[in-house]
Amino acid sequence: MPKHSALERAWPAKEIVEDLLELRKRSPLTHIMTNIVVTNWTANVLLAVGASPAMVIAEEEAGEFVKIANGLLINVGTITSNDAKAMKIAATVAHQTNTPWVLDPVAVGALGFRTETTKKLLDLKPTVIRGNASEILTLAGIAGKGKGVDSTVNSKDALPYAQELSGKTGAVVAVSGEVDYVTNGKETIEIYGGDPIMTKVTGVGCSLGALIASFLGIQKDPLRASASASAVFAIAGSRSAKKSNGPGSFAINFIDQLSQLSIE
């Protein structure tokens, strides 16, 4: 793999290579319960990297499908009452069957319904919680200065609260920002890379949660799975940005880079 020195100092390239190769070999079936804004993008991201996404959201099917899935993402971005019921069923079954799952608490704290739903989902023991700094602060019980889905808090500032949240919930916590942090409360991995243009394409952050769910399907260590997924994202983001003239070309190049990411 080509040199990405800051990234490699934080997370060994060997682990990324092993996990990416295993994902491409096994193509984990990933149950995606995400928001309507990013569904198509998320599916394309997972297909590009080598996973098998399935967008099953119906209350009548959610529990049945999660039993055969290798990983589950629950993203509350455009949550409805019916979605909340289906998500609770899926998370309950995932907890009962030891299916690893990711909670993405989009804009938690900004509105009451999604906040209450997220609190209930936390009780069902997500394997990984992925969010921006404001969302992680809110979940840790801190009054963050959130403005919807964008973060006004630095990811480094949120790290102590991510560690606290991990300790409270038992989940690995992944904080997205200029530098990504992945922590299990005791060990923390820093992921460097990516590019600011990634914030100009809707769904990029949400699809990282889905990618983590896919990596959980092939890697039993949730800290390593989250770090490998974040690193793949960062590498693809950095390379795509160098080839892009703006958000439109970046979106296309990002999918291509995920698909073509070389193992050298």
Curated annotation (Swiss-Prot):
<dbReference type="InterPro" id="IPR029056">
    <property type="entry name" value="Ribokinase-like"/>
</dbReference>
<comment type="pathway">
    <text>Cofactor biosynthesis; thiamine diphosphate biosynthesis; 4-methyl-5-(2-phosphoethyl)-thiazole from 5-(2-hydroxyethyl)-4-methylthiazole: step 1/1.</text>
</comment>
<feature type="binding site">
    <location>
        <position position="130"/>
    </location>
    <ligand>
        <name>ATP</name>
    </ligand>
</feature>
<keyword id="KW-0067">ATP-binding</keyword>
<keyword id="KW-0460">Magnesium</keyword>
<feature type="binding site">
    <location>
        <position position="203"/>
    </location>
    <ligand>
        <name>substrate</name>
    </ligand>
</feature>
<keyword id="KW-0784">Thiamine biosynthesis</keyword>
<dbReference type="InterPro" id="IPR000417">
    <property type="entry name" value="Hyethyz_kinase"/>
</dbReference>
<dbReference type="Pfam" id="PF02110">
    <property type="entry name" value="HK"/>
</dbReference>
<comment type="similarity">
    <text>Belongs to the Thz kinase family.</text>
</comment>
<feature type="binding site">
    <location>
        <position position="55"/>
    </location>
    <ligand>
        <name>substrate</name>
    </ligand>
</feature>
<dbReference type="GO" id="GO:0005524">
    <property type="term" value="F:ATP binding"/>
</dbReference>
<dbReference type="GO" id="GO:0000287">
    <property type="term" value="F:magnesium ion binding"/>
</dbReference>
<keyword id="KW-0547">Nucleotide-binding</keyword>
<protein>
    <recommendedName>
        <fullName>Hydroxyethylthiazole kinase</fullName>
        <ecNumber>2.7.1.50</ecNumber>
    </recommendedName>
</protein>
<dbReference type="GO" id="GO:0004417">
    <property type="term" value="F:hydroxyethylthiazole kinase activity"/>
</dbReference>
<dbReference type="GO" id="GO:0009229">
    <property type="term" value="P:thiamine diphosphate biosynthetic process"/>
</dbReference>
<comment type="function">
    <text>Catalyzes the phosphorylation of the hydroxyl group of 4-methyl-5-beta-hydroxyethylthiazole (THZ).</text>
</comment>
<keyword id="KW-0418">Kinase</keyword>
<feature type="binding site">
    <location>
        <position position="176"/>
    </location>
    <ligand>
        <name>ATP</name>
    </ligand>
</feature>
<keyword id="KW-0479">Metal-binding</keyword>
<keyword id="KW-0808">Transferase</keyword>
<dbReference type="GO" id="GO:0009228">
    <property type="term" value="P:thiamine biosynthetic process"/>
</dbReference>
